[in-house]
């Protein structure tokens, strides 16, 4: 039987952060999810429920999304990574495994880079290195840049095949299910998320990410073409690439197939990812 979620609102820096935790067993390192742009935490529940029920999972709405308050001022990825670390402190988590999806994949890269001792393993799904990337078609990017699909969920039913590809091209029901779970935080929160990634890139420090990393890519992703995930897997030293026969939201549409791949990766016993240099001997 699925574990119930524990919802909490965390107050940090005059910011209300809505969190959801699916409790698990202590023998598995908890998994922290960074969601896509505009996406409230409920949208990843189908993926969470496909994972091992013993795995504790932490999801949250970033500022301006879903049930989290919208900040008065814009933010950038380093500041949001810091806020996430403080949220984990508040919730009493030490080291976690991290998965980032699309926009959340950029934030996951920043978190793994800035807080290596907090991130044991890294999973990057349908994401890129930021400004240094091979973009999707202009029409698709223009649709993505508008918050309309989250402010007006019925809109996503019309554009989902074009922007998400994969199963959304074949099954209209998927778009309806997706739209039914949308909880908009408003246009300003969406624009703050766009601003967070404006001009940002990880390309110059990806080689410093030492965590074991699984890069997951859809082979029919209109938003982030496959070549971008190949670039991530090439630049991150301890990375492996796995290609999924689906589109941008394969984590949801192919949850039952993708979850075992992720669980196998997370449970592999490998050399400790974060190596701390020994102090120099005196003399």
From Swiss-Prot:
Please provide one cellular component term from the Gene Ontology annotations of this protein: membrane
Asked if Hydrolase is a keyword of the record, the answer is yes
PROSITE patterns listed in its UniProt record: LIPASE_SER
Q: Which Gene3D superfamilies match?
A: alpha/beta hydrolase
Q: Which domain of life is it from?
A: Bacteria
- Which keywords does the record carry? Hydrolase, Lipid degradation, Lipid metabolism
Tell me the ranges covered by the AB hydrolase-1 domain, including all copies: 30-253
What is one Gene Ontology biological process annotated in the Swiss-Prot or TrEMBL record?
acylglycerol catabolic process
Instruction: Report the active site residues.
Output: 102
Give the enzyme's main class according to its UniProt record, as a single word: hydrolase
Free-text function comment from the UniProt entry: Complements a mutant that does not degrade PHA; might be a lipase.
Similarity annotation: Belongs to the AB hydrolase superfamily. Lipase family.
Anything else known:
Pseudomonas oleovorans accumulates poly(3-hydroxyalkanoates) after growth on medium chain length hydrocarbons. Large amounts of this polyester are synthesized when cells are grown under nitrogen-limiting conditions. When nitrogen is resupplied in the medium, the accumulated PHA is degraded.
Protein name in UniProt: Poly(3-hydroxyalkanoate) depolymerase
UniProt organism field: Ectopseudomonas oleovorans
The UniProt gene name for this protein comes to phaZ
